[in-house]
UniProtKB/Swiss-Prot annotation:
Belongs to the DapA family. SUPFAM superfamilies: Aldolase. It is an enzyme of class 4 (lyase). It comes from Nitrosomonas europaea (strain ATCC 19718 / CIP 103999 / KCTC 2705 / NBRC 14298). Its main location: cytoplasm. This is 4-hydroxy-tetrahydrodipicolinate synthase. Catalyzes the condensation of (S)-aspartate-beta-semialdehyde [(S)-ASA] and pyruvate to 4-hydroxy-tetrahydrodipicolinate (HTPA). The gene is dapA. It catalyses: L-aspartate 4-semialdehyde + pyruvate = (2S,4S)-4-hydroxy-2,3,4,5-tetrahydrodipicolinate + H2O + H(+). Pyruvate binds at T45, I203.
Length: 292
């Protein structure tokens, strides 16, 4: 079981939109140095909707090869086609990924039974730990707690990333899942609350900008050091909120670029962060103690 701060890592790109693999590898080294507990590649924050199939493969393979066992690599392998999700998951296992993150199928709006059959088919086709990803604000389909509990009985399905931000719902899930099934926060603003209720970690956007602090917050929460966990969360709270003033990953790429780690290039239809938000995010970074 993976625990702690798992970064939903950005995908660096050159000004012409090509993948910047040199900076991608440098980011992995940065997160290892900063004590990040795991890396999630080619997820929402990694711009999975706008990388093609070959690039998706390349990013997963590069992450696994460069990490070289120094940090767990969780590959984003979700798709709204079950066959495509299986193919990506097979590739990830063969590439050496430690686990996969599989988002609920988007746009085609399956029923709860359709969701169950989708994830069951992937788990039966590929022997790799799978974390479900529930983000109804993007997918317009919601993995209910009851469906998550059904899926938790399937070998290989080891956890869920809950990006609803609904703490009552997360608490309900934590009380009902088996001990070997992990519940991760997918909402930075409520991550600490979920951790204190028994959550196992966070798959974090904020960790791109403040990786060591996110790791330390998780560590403090697990140790029962509420004062320290709250202190860190207070420092980070504006980042938790302001990194979503426009669609993720627009703001976080701007912030990571200010740190000198990447440039802030995005692929259409995403566009550069509106100038009206530059100062807002700069102040949030300064509040967190990040040099801008």
């Amino acid at each position: 079981m993976f625990t702690g701060s798992l970064v939903a890592i950005v995908t660096p790109m050159l000004e012409d939109g090509a993948l910047d693999l040199d900076r991608f590898c440098a980011l992995i080294d940065f997160h290892i140095e900063q004590k990040t507990d795991g890396i999630v590649v080619v997820g929402t924050t990694g711009e999975s909707p706008t990388v093609d199939f070959d690039e998706h493969h390349l990013l997963i393979r590069t992450a696994v090869t460069h990490a070289a066992g120094r940090i767990p690599v969780i590959a984003g392998t979700g798709a709204n086609s079950t066959r495509e999700a299986i193919e990506l998951t097979v590739f990830s296992k063969n590439a050496g990924a430690d686990a996969c993150l599989s988002v609920a199928p988007y746009y085609n709006k399956p029923t709860q039974e359709g969701l169950y059959q989708h994830f069951k088919a992937i788990a039966e086709a590929v022997d790799i730990p799978m974390i479900l990803y529930n983000v109804p604000g993007r997918t317009v389909v919601d993995i209910s707690n009851d469906t998550a509990l059904r899926l938790a009985q399937i070998p290989g399905i080891v956890g869920i990333k809950d990006a609803t931000g609904n703490i009552a719902r997360g608490c309900d899930l934590l009380q009902r899942v088996p001990d070997n099934f992990a519940v991760y926060s997918g909402d930075d603003a409520t991550a600490l609350a979920l951790l204190l209720l028994g959550g196992h970690g966070t798959i974090s956007v904020t960790a791109n900008v403040a990786p060591r602090l996110m790791h330390e917050m998780c560590t403090a929460a697990f140790a029962g050091d509420l004062a320290r966990a709250r202190e860190i969360n207070t420092r980070l709270f504006r980042l938790h909120i302001d990194l979503f003033v426009e669609a993720n990953p627009i703001p976080v790429k701007w912030a990571v670029a200010r740190m000198g780690l990447i440039n802030d290039s995005l692929r259409l239809p995403l566009t550069a962060l509106s100038s009206q938000y530059h100062e807002l995010i700069r102040k949030a970074m300064l509040q967190a103690g990040i040099t801008v």
